């Protein structure tokens, strides 16, 4: 009951600041929360999804697609032991949330995974444009580099990007995190 009251206060305060929360978004948000298992509780899910959805709207206008992606990012990142907000920042820098993005080096999808990883792990049939597959690969790779770097985010991000020893890439991810996802 208290959680519902707090959510309504949050929604009403959003309306007071001119950011109208429409009925369709509220309905989609409820459905997404019901299907998500990576949150501690329903209230945490409601607040996190609503906050991040507002920021993600500039990249993904469709509310259903946006909330579905946020749920997938939260699930994959928490399963890998990563903060979802850092994964959001990395995706913003890597692909601007374009699941079909392909870099000049051939990296694919949201988290820009190099296709050689499919062969390396014996799964050549995997589709890196598939959101859940791409997130699973990306979060696992990032967590590996974070462990290898003794939880030094700058080093882990540079390794992830293939720019170890340089810090322009970690700065870009950290800036995106501070500006949009923190």
Residue spans for each PLM region:
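Boundary at the C-terminal end of the N-terminal hydrophobic targeting segment
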Residues: 16-18
């Amino acid at each position: 009951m208290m959680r519902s009251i707090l959510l309504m206060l949050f929604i009403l305060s959003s309306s007071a600041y001119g950011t109208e929360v429409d009925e369709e978004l509220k309905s989609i948000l409820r459905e997404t929360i019901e299907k998500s298992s990576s949150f501690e509780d329903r209230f945490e899910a409601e607040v996190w999804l609503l906050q991040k959805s507002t920021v993600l709207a500039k990249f993904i206008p469709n509310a259903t697609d946006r909330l579905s992606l946020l749920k997938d990012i939260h699930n994959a990142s928490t399963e890998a032991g990563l903060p979802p907000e850092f994964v959001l920042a990395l995706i913003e820098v890597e692909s601007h949330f374009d699941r079909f993005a392909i870099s000049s080096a051939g990296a694919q999808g949201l988290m820009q995974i190099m296709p050689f990883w499919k062969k390396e792990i014996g799964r050549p049939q995997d589709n890196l444009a598939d959101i859940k597959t791409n997130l699973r690969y990306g979060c696992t790779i990032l967590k590996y580099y974070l462990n290898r770097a003794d939880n030094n985010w700058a080093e882990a991000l540079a390794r992830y990007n293939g720019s170890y020893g340089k810090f322009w890439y970690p700065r870009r991810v950290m800036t995106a995190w501070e500006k949009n996802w923190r």
